[in-house]
C-alpha cells in the first residue's frame, strides 16, 4: 500500500520527463544534466516549446491537459529506476513510520468537540478560500487581459483537479478508517476514506503552482503556510491521521510542479521550473553540502583532537557548544586546519601530529570534499567493556536527588559487582541519505533498595512540594530490590537526509550543548539518547550585509519524547503516577540552540529546552507552538501552561596574549526561564579553563571546571532544589531516572579537574578529580561525593584499541548511610575498528 502511494508521488518526478524525452518548458539545463550526460546516464534533452502546450484556456484544452496528466501519473511506476530509490526509500520509510505511529499521535490530540469543530471549520474555509482565490485569479486575469494571472488561476485549478482525482482513487483503493471511526486504529481496507486527504492534496497543489507563478518569498510563505495550516487542521480536527496528510501533501506539491513544468508559458514571467529532484539533490555527483553523513559519537577520540587544534587557533569554525559533528563537517574542519598549519611557519609539532591521524581517519570524507558519489557503508566499531564496582555506588534510585558514581555514560545501567556491555556500531550513506545504528547488550547486577530514610527524603524533595497543605502525604518509594538488567538496547540509531548543509534526522541521537567537559547544564550525554526528530545546520553559514558581523552561525532544533517519567502534577487533577510504573503518556521535549562566532577567538551560544504535554495534556499544534513561543507561565497542566522551560548561555574565549595557551569558557543555565540573562539570581554556572599544552611539556594538557546549582540566594516562590525540577513534571529533567543536564544535580557545588598526557593523538594517560557537595538546605543533612582516578587508552594495532580506568570514590549522605562509604570502580574496554584508516567510497 505504501509502495503504491509512493509510485503515485513519482508522478512529479523525473520518470515522466524521461518518458517524454524533453525538458519541460521554462526549464534551464542544470549542471547535473551535464554531469549525468558525461557519466553516460540517460537524461532529458531540450527542445523548443510547442506553442500548443501553452493553450491555457477554458475548454477542451483543459480536458486534454488533465487526461495527459492522469495518463502520466498512473503510468509513472513503469518508468521508475534504481536511482529513484534515493527519494523513494526515505519517503516510503517516513510514510511507513508515520503510519505505525498514527494512532499514538492521534491519541494525543484533544477530544473536545468544540476544539475539533473549530479545526474542521478552519480547514473547510481554507480550502474554499483556495478554490475561490484560484477562480478569482483566473477571472481577474481574463477581464483585465493579464495573461499571467489568467494562466496562474487556470493551472492552479488543473493541478487541484489532477491531485483530487489521484487521492480519490487512492481513498477507494485503501479504504482506511478515519480517526473517529471504529476503534480509532485507522485500519486499511475497512471501507473508510481517510487515506489520503483531499483537503491537503488540493491545498498543496494550488500552493505549488502559485509559488512557481509568483516566486517571491512572501507569496511562497503565504501559499505554503496556508496549505500546511489546512493539513495540520485536518489532523487536529481528527479528520485524518498524520500520514494521510503527509502523502497527500506530497502528491499535491508534486502535481503542481508537474502541471507548471508542462504548461507554464515562460514568456509570461513566473519562476524558473526546476524538477523536484534538482531542488532536493542539487546535482550529481553530489556536492558536500548535499551528502548524508553520520555524526561522530561523543565518546570518540576525534573531539579532543579537534578541540586541541581549535585551542591552538587552527579550527576557527568548530562549534564546541554544539556537538556531535558529522564526519563531513569534521573533514571540512580538518582540511581548513591543514591549510592553516601549512601556512604557519611557527606551527607546533603537536598540530602536525594531530592532523596526520585525523587525515588518516577521514581519508574518504576528505576526498569527498571535491564532490563525489558517496555510496558507502562501514562497520564502525565492535567493542566490549567490563566494569567492576566494589562497595556500594550511587546508582539507580539515587542519581536524580543525591548524585551518581558514573557520569556522562549515555544512561547505561550499573550496580555493585560486575557490569558488562558489548556492542557494535555502523553506518551507511548514499547521496543525501544516511543511516546509523549503535546496538549494545547491557548487563548490571541486582541491588537492594535504598533505606527508609533515603526513600522518605526522595518523597519529600520530589512529591511533597506539590501536595496541598492538609492533603494526605504522597507515597514513598517502595522497599523493593532493584532487579538485575540484561537487555539489548539500540543506544544510538537514526536515519536522515541532508540538503544544502541542513540535516534532517529521526531516531535516538546524542547531544552535547556546551563547551564544558564535565557535562553541559542544558543537554549532555548523562542520560541515554532521546528519540527525536532533529533539524541541524551541520556547517555554519554567514548572514548577508551588515549582519555578517555576527560571524559563522549554526542552528539546531529538535522535537522528542522522554521515557521513564513516573509522576506528573496538574492544577486540575492533582498528583498522579506511581513509583513502580512509568506514565503511559510520557511528556514531549523540544529545544533549539543557536551558536555564533563573531571572531575566530570567541564563540557564544543560546539554547532553550521545554518539557510539555504528557499525561492529561494532549499534544496539539497549539501546545507545541506555545512551548516554543510563549514567554509567560500558567498553572501546571492547564491550557495556559507553556511547559517546563530551561534556558542556557555558553561561551568560549581564547585569551589575548596567550591565545594558543589558554581558553576560558562558561556555561550558564536557568530553570523556568528562557535565558539566564533575565534573572542571574536564578542561574547556575559552569566556569572553566583549558590549556592545550603546558610550557616545557607540550604533550600535556590541563582542564579545570567549577560548577554549581546552589545560587547564593534563592528567592520565593522557588524552593531549594528547584533546578531540574518542576511543579508539573515532578520526576524532573530526567529520562529513565538519569539527568539530561549536568551531574551536579538539583542543588550542589562541585569541581572537575583533568590532566592528560598525549603520547599520540589517540594514545593518552589521564588523571582526574571530581568533587560534589549537595546542600543541606535541599537534602536533609546534605552530602558529599569525591572521586579520584586515572585512565589510559592505547591503540595496540591500527584496528585494535584498549582502554582502562580506575576510580576511587568516597561519599557521605547521612540519609543513605550513617557512615562514610567508599567504592572502587575499575573498567576495561576492548574495541575493534574494522575500517580504521582505510579509504572507502568514490570521489570526483
What do the predicted segments below correspond to?
Residues 17-57, 61, 275-417, 423-431, ...:
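N-terminal periplasmic/intermembrane-space "pro-region" immediately following the signal or transit peptide
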Residues 34-236:
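Hydrophobic alpha-helical bundle signature of multipass membrane enzymes
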Residues 80-87, 145-149, 214-219, 261-275, ...:
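Short loop/turn motifs that connect adjacent beta-strands in outer-membrane beta-barrel proteins
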Residues 99-103, 113, 232, 430-432, ...:
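Transmembrane beta-strands of outer-membrane beta-barrel pores
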Residues 212, 257, 427-430, 496-499, ...:
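Residue-level signature of outer-membrane beta-barrel architecture
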Residues 262, 272-288, 594, 730-731, ...:
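Outer-membrane beta-barrel "beta-signal"
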Residues 511-512, 530-733, 746-758, 765-789:
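Signature for the C-terminal beta-barrel architecture of outer-membrane proteins
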Amino acid at each position: 500500500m505504501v509502495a503504491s502511494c509512493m509510485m503515485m508521488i513519482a508522478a512529479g518526478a523525473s520518470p515522466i520527463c524521461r518518458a517524454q524525452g524533453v525538458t519541460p518548458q521554462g526549464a534551464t539545463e542544470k549542471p547535473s544534466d551535464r554531469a549525468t550526460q558525461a557519466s553516460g546516464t540517460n537524461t532529458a534533452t531540450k527542445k523548443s516549446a510547442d506553442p500548443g502546450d501553452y493553450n491555457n484556456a477554458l475548454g477542451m484544452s483543459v480536458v486534454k491537459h488533465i487526461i495527459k496528466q492522469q495518463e502520466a501519473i498512473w503510468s509513472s511506476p513503469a518508468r521508475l529506476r534504481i536511482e529513484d530509490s534515493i527519494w523513494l526509500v526515505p519517503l516510503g520509510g517516513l510514510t511507513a513510520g508515520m503510519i505505525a505511529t498514527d494512532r499514538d499521535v492521534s491519541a494525543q490530540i484533544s477530544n473536545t468537540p468544540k476544539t475539533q469543530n473549530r479545526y474542521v471549520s478552519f480547514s473547510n474555509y481554507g480550502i474554499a478560500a483556495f478554490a475561490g482565490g484560484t477562480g478569482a485569479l483566473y477571472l481577474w486575469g481574463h477581464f483585465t487581459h493579464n495573461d499571467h494571472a489568467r494562466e496562474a488561476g487556470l493551472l492552479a485549478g488543473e493541478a487541484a483537479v489532477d491531485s483530487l482525482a489521484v487521492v480519490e482513487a487512492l481513498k477507494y483503493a485503501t479504504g482506511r478508517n478515519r480517526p473517529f471511526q471504529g476503534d480509532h486504529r485507522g485500519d486499511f481496507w475497512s471501507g473508510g476514506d481517510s487515506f489520503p486527504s483531499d483537503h491537503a492534496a488540493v491545498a498543496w497543489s494550488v500552493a505549488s503552482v502559485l509559488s512557481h507563478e509568483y516566486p517571491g518569498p512572501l507569496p511562497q510563505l503565504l501559499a505554503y503556510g496556508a496549505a500546511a495550516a489546512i493539513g495540520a487542521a485536518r489532523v487536529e480536527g481528527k479528520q485524518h491521521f498524520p500520514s494521510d496528510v503527509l502523502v497527500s501533501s506530497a502528491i499535491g506539491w508534486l502535481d503542481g510542479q508537474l502541471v507548471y513544468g508542462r504548461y507554464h508559458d515562460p514568456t509570461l514571467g513566473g519562476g524558473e521550473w526546476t524538477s523536484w529532484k534538482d531542488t532536493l539533490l542539487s546535482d550529481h555527483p553530489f556536492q558536500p553540502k548535499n551528502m548524508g553523513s553520520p555524526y561522530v559519537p561523543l565518546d570518540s577520540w576525534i573531539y579532543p583532537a579537534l578541540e586541541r587544534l581549535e585551542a591552538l587557533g587552527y579550527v576557527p569554525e568548530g562549534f564546541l557548544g554544539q556537538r556531535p559533528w558529522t564526519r563531513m563537517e569534521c573533514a571540512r574542519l580538518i582540511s581548513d586546519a591543514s591549510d592553516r598549519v601549512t601556512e604557519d611557519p611557527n606551527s607546533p609539532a603537536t598540530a602536525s601530529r594531530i592532523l596526520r591521524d585525523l587525515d588518516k581517519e577521514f581519508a574518504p570524507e576528505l576526498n569527498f570534499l571535491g564532490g563525489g558519489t558517496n555510496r558507502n557503508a562501514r562497520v564502525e566499531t565492535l567493542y566490549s567493556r567490563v566494569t567492576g564496582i566494589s562497595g556500594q555506588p550511587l546508582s539507580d534510585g539515587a542519581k536524580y536527588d543525591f548524585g551518581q558514581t558514573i557520569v556522562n555514560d549515555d544512561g547505561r545501567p550499573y550496580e555493585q559487582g560486575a557490569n558488562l556491555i558489548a556492542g557494535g556500531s555502523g553506518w551507511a550513506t548514499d547521496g543525501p541519505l544516511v543511516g546509523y545504528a549503535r546496538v549494545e547488550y547491557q548487563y548490571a547486577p541486582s541491588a537492594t533498595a535504598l533505606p527508609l530514610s533515603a526513600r522518605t527524603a526522595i518523597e519529600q524533595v520530589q512529591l511533597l512540594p506539590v501536595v496541598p497543605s492538609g492533603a494526605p502525604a504522597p507515597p514513598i518509594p517502595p522497599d523493593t530490590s532493584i532487579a538485575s538488567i540484561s537487555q539489548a538496547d539500540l543506544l544510538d540509531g537514526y536515519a536522515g537526509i541532508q540538503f544544502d548543509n541542513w540535516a534532517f534526522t529521526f531516531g535516538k541521537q546524542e547531544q552535547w550543548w556546551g563547551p564544558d567537559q564535565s557535562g553541559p547544564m542544558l543537554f549532555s550525554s548523562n542520560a541515554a539518547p532521546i528519540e527525536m526528530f532533529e533539524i541541524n545546520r551541520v556547517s555554519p553559514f554567514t548572514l548577508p550585509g551588515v549582519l555578517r558581523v555576527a560571524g559563522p552561525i549554526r542552528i539546531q532544533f529538535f522535537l522528542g519524547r522522554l521515557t521513564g517519567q513516573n509522576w506528573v502534577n496538574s492544577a486540575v487533577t492533582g498528583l498522579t503516577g506511581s513509583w513502580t510504573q512509568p506514565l503511559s503518556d510520557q511528556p514531549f521535549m523540544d529545544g533549539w540552540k543557536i551558536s555564533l562566532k563573531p571572531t575566530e577567538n570567541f564563540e557564544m551560544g543560546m539554547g532553550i529546552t521545554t518539557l510539555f504535554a504528557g499525561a492529561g495534556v494532549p499534544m496539539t499544534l497549539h501546545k507545541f507552538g506555545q512551548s516554543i513561543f510563549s514567554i509567560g507561565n500558567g498553572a501546571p497542566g492547564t491550557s495556559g501552561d507553556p511547559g517546563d522551560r530551561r534556558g542556557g548561555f555558553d561561551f568560549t574565549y581564547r585569551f589575548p596574549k596567550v591565545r594558543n595557551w589558554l581558553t576560558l569558557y562558561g556555561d550558564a543555565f536557568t530553570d523556568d526561564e528562557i535565558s539566564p540573562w533575565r534573572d542571574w539570581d536564578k542561574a547556575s554556572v559552569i566556569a572553566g579553563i583549558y590549556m592545550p599544552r603546558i610550557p616545557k611539556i607540550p604533550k600535556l594538557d590541563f582542564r579545570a571546571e567549577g560548577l554549581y546549582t546552589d545560587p547564593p540566594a534563592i528567592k520565593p516562590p522557588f524552593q531549594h532544589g528547584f533546578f531540574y525540577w518542576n511543579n508539573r513534571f515532578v520526576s524532573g529533567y530526567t529520562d529513565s531516572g538519569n539527568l539530561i543536564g549536568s551531574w551536579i544535580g538539583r542543588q550542589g557545588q562541585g569541581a572537575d579537574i583533568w590532566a592528560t598526557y598525549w603520547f599520540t593523538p589517540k594514545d593518552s594517560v589521564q588523571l582526574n578529580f571530581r568533587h560534589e557537595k549537595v546542600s543541606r538546605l535541599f537534602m536533609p543533612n546534605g552530602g558529599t561525593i569525591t572521586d579520584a582516578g586515572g585512565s589510559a587508552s592505547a591503540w595496540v594495532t591500527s584496528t585494535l584499541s584498549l582502554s582502562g580506568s580506575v576510580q576511587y570514590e568516597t561519599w557521605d549522605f547521612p540519609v543513605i548511610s550513617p557512615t562514610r562509604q567508599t567504592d572502587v570502580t575499575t573498567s576495561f574496554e576492548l574495541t575493534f575498528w574494522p575500517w580504521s584508516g582505510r579509504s572507502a567510497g568514490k570521489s570526483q
